[in-house]
Amino acid sequence: MAFGIRRAYPTPIVKPLWPYAVGGVITFFLFAKAANASMNTEEFINDPRNPRFKAGGVKEEH
């Protein structure tokens, strides 16, 4: 018995799992879009943690 030699089986890996990969990519982009929409609301636009605020792209309203 040769334990170091593995036999190659024709097991499909990508074919049954492609819907999960596509769903993951779609979910990632939808969450990114929702996060960007949330960052640009009036409530969070002047938050110092907002990247646009740090870059100086937002005027402070007094």
Swiss-Prot record:
Signal peptide feature range: none
GO cellular component: mitochondrial inner membrane; proton-transporting ATP synthase complex
Transport listed as a keyword: yes
Record carries keyword Mitochondrion: yes
GO biological processes: mitochondrial proton-transporting ATP synthase complex assembly; proton motive force-driven ATP synthesis
UniProt-recorded Gene Ontology molecular function terms: proton-transporting ATP synthase activity, rotational mechanism
Predominant subcellular localization, coarse grouping: mitochondrion
Domain of life: Eukaryota
Any matching Pfam family: ATP-synt_J
UniProt subcellular location: Mitochondrion inner membrane
Segments crossing the lipid bilayer: 13-32
Keywords for this protein: ATP synthesis, CF(0), Hydrogen ion transport, Ion transport, Membrane, Mitochondrion, Mitochondrion inner membrane, Transmembrane, Transmembrane helix, Transport
Membrane topology type: Single-pass membrane protein
Biological role: Mitochondrial membrane ATP synthase (F(1)F(0) ATP synthase or Complex V) produces ATP from ADP in the presence of a proton gradient across the membrane which is generated by electron transport complexes of the respiratory chain. F-type ATP synthases consist of two structural domains, F(1) - containing the extramembraneous catalytic core, and F(0) - containing the membrane proton channel, linked together by a central stalk and a peripheral stalk.
Family: Belongs to the ATPase j subunit family.
Quaternary structure and partners: F-type ATP synthases have 2 components, the catalytic core F(1) and the membrane-embedded component F(0), linked together by a central stalk and a peripheral stalk. The central stalk, also called rotor shaft, is often seen as part of F(1). The peripheral stalk is seen as part of F(0). F(0) contains the membrane channel next to the rotor. F-type ATP synthases form dimers but each monomer functions independently in ATP generation.
Name of the featured protein: ATP synthase subunit J, mitochondrial
Gene name for this UniProt entry: ATP18
